[in-house]
């Protein structure tokens, strides 16, 4: 294999502090397919990125272990895969896949938090809330992971939705029932600035009692940058 992640990869998981896996699934995407290729493509693109931060500092402390891809369309199987993946001690990164993979990943994260006696938090960065009960007849659509997270036990006050600019009618009704959900629409962030948003989130979740799961969908970006 080519020099994936430019020398950040560590072959020994016990010596690593960052853990990567992929879930190449796009069965539940409603508008176009191709997201299942992302884990492979992101790894390929990493060949050309030097291991430096934005200030030019070498990321010498990063030791990344790639656990490979978990390939299944069964969320129970994927959840079991994630239970094992989250046993690695360190920082975890999961490449999707359409956003339905969150149904499995946030369940595994929730269960890990319970074992550690921590409060599970979701910061969902997306153009859409993904809080539909069903979408196109499915409860497992890419439009449903936050709805399934609430069903699973996440508290409304520990879910923050960032970058929202598109809603389904049913989601508006859901927000009326779940008023403690924290929502920062795209226009809100534009007005306050990203630094203010980061400050708010750091303040809210700074206590060690929280563990934070960050979910990022590329359509949270302005379409001029990610058409």
State where each predicted segment sits.
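Conserved alpha-helical scaffold segments that buttress catalytic/binding sites
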Residues: 2-227
